[in-house]
From Swiss-Prot:
Disulfide bonds join 20-483, 58-290, 71-83, 106-151, 294-318, 490-494. It is found in: Virion membrane; Host apical cell membrane. It comes from Influenza A virus (strain A/Chicken/Hong Kong/37.4/2002 H5N1 genotype X2). Coiled coil: none annotated. This is Hemagglutinin.
Length: 567
């Protein structure tokens, strides 16, 4: 009879209704790193590091770049004859110059403060070229004879288009005294130069006067130049050299020019009609007839990601450059799908695995939820409220990171002349240091956010578990794997009340108490039965062993193998 009662109790336990709390799992192989772990597989992740570009030069926010092709900035501004296509240029978003353009200073020489001029251009979007001293106004000097084979055009000697190389006329070079008043509302970029002859013979041949000077003055400039006559190696067939200068003439200011030889006078100036964010970018790429918000020398980036690793020099609304190769942000949960387990031959049916043992691939409509089983069947149901709150929280966090990083950011290369190499090296070291720090900060940010996200999901599952536990109290048993086993019958309506937080504890408490006491009694009685059987088995085994030893002794005495003496 006792065995029958025990069997019925076990059968009733097997058929007990259950509800489990768990989380979503899928076939994702996405992995993220956290502060504590590496290569954590998650259900969902978002890559926040852009690694691709289109390999083209594009318009920036609809404004075309000024691509100088084979011309340098100096060749463009002075008017190298091979750069005639850039005589008048429209508004530009940025300037593109090759690393070693063929059409630079056709007549050999230097451009004074060239790097500073390029820096100035990085804040300008449009020039308007205007004539300030007409070439025809030099009646006492030869204004058309100043040409060179070093600057050919259509097979003939020519010269820079925007300046005039003044030569003596009728064996005389009268002293020049000219001034120009800037009546425009905009600043003017004005260029001029000086010729350094190869020897004294060339000096008098071109300028008549053996000793000459050039004087240039504005409200902020006071310059006096003298030619440096010296024998030099030929470059582009020329032993002479030219040195060019520039200044910014403010509105209502005047520039005063005075010279008695070797003067390369300004004819055209550039009116700065629009200032703004620009850049001079070194690139060999061609124009791609495309539009972008972010341009690099390697190509355009069209991405909403907060970081990129394409090139440290950029122009436009660009992600932050980092040296990392991988930055992946966790948006989902740890992905640990439930493993199938073999059913044991005896014992209770294993509960559906909850958040301790693994996730559920069967729950596809939410991140957290329930699995129930009763006489009416079984099934999964997502907890929509906690899932939606979690989705909103993670989405807001990702968007916040992207918005913070996707700001107007320009990082263009700085150029230094030969006398500033130590400064250039120091600048590179500082920039490399900044990039290292920024890369470290970005990687640390991702690791910390991933740790917080996964902890956030774990906390949400625990909160859902506690919500059920506080409702059921002693009406159900905690199985230790995210599941509860009811001490009472719980149909679908009862299950739904647990899920939505309206479970009526008093309604089921009496039935649960009776079943709980019955199960406890069965356990105690079965334990006593097992103890009696154990004692009986021990005594019986000992008695059987004693009988076997006595029988063996009598047999050995009878055949003489053992001597028996009775005293």
């Amino acid at each position: 009879m006792k065995k029958i009662v025990l069997l019925l109790a076990i059968v009733s336990l097997v058929k007990s209704d259950q509800i489990c709390i768990g989380y979503h799992a899928n076939n994702s192989t996405e992995q993220v790193d956290t502060i504590m772990e590496k290569n954590v597989t998650v259900t969902h992740a978002q890559d926040i590091l852009e690694k691709t570009h289109n390999g083209k030069l594009c318009d920036l926010d609809g404004v075309k770049p000024l691509i100088l092709r084979d011309c340098s900035v100096a060749g463009w501004l002075l008017g190298n004859p091979m750069c005639d296509e850039f005589i008048n240029v429209p508004e530009w978003s940025y300037i593109v110059e090759k690393a070693n353009p063929a059409n630079d200073l056709c007549y050999p020489g230097d451009f004074n403060d060239y790097e500073e001029l390029k820096h100035l251009l990085s804040r300008i979007n449009h020039f308007e070229k205007i004539q300030i001293i007409p070439k025809s106004s030099w009646s006492n000097h030869e204004a058309s004879s100043g040409v060179s084979s070093a600057c050919p055009y259509n097979g003939k000697s020519s010269f820079f288009r925007n300046v005039v190389w003044l030569i003596k006329k009728d064996s005389a070079y009268p002293t020049i005294k000219r001034s120009y008043n800037n009546t425009n509302q905009e600043d003017l970029l004005i260029l001029w130069g000086i010729h350094h002859p190869n020897d004294a013979a060339e000096q008098t041949k071109l300028y008549q006067n053996p000793t000459t000077y050039i004087s240039v003055g504005t409200s902020t400039l006071n310059q006096r130049l003298v030619p440096k006559i010296s024998t030099r190696s030929k470059v582009n067939g020329q032993s002479g050299r030219m040195e060019f200068f520039w200044t910014i003439l403010k509105p209502s200011d005047a520039i005063n020019l005075e010279s008695n030889g070797n003067f390369i006078a300004p004819e055209y100036a550039y009116k700065i009609v629009k200032k703004g964010d620009s850049a001079i970018m070194k690139s060999e790429l061609e124009y791609g007839n495309c539009n972008t918000k972010c341009q690099t020398p390697m190509g355009a980036i069209n991405s909403s990601m907060p970081f990129h690793n394409i090139h440290p020099l950029t122009i436009g609304e660009c992600p932050k450059y980092v040296k990392s190769n991988r930055l992946v942000l966790a948006t989902g949960l740890r992905n640990t799908p439930q493993r199938e387990r073999r059913r044991k031959k005896r014992g209770l049916f294993g509960a559906i695995a909850g958040f301790i043992e693994g996730g559920w691939q069967g729950m596809v409509d939410g991140w957290y939820g329930y699995h129930h089983s009763n006489e009416q069947g079984s099934g999964y149901a997502a907890d929509k409220e906690s899932t939606q709150k979690a989705i909103d929280g993670v989405t807001n966090k990702v968007n916040s990171i992207i918005n913070k990083m996707n700001t107007q950011f320009e990082a263009v290369g700085r150029e230094f002349n030969n006398l500033e190499r130590r400064i250039e090296n120091l600048n590179k070291k500082m920039e490399d240091g900044f990039l290292d720090v920024w890369t470290y900060n970005a990687e640390l940010l991702v690791l910390m956010e991933n740790e917080r996200t996964l902890d956030f999901h774990d906390s949400n599952v625990k909160n859902l578990y506690d919500k059920v536990r506080l409702q059921l109290r002693d009406n159900a048993k905690e199985l230790g794997n995210g599941c509860f086993e009811f001490y009472h019958k719980c149909d679908n309506e009862c299950m739904e009340s647990v899920k939505n937080g309206t479970y009526d504890y008093p309604q089921y408490s009496e039935e649960a108490r009776l079943n709980r006491e019955e199960i406890s009694g069965v356990k105690l009685e079965s334990m006593g039965t097992y103890q009696i059987l154990s004692i009986y088995s021990t005594v019986a085994s000992s008695l059987a062993l004693a009988i076997m030893v006595a029988g063996l002794s009598l047999w050995m005495c009878s055949n003489g193998s053992l001597q028996c003496r009775i005293c």
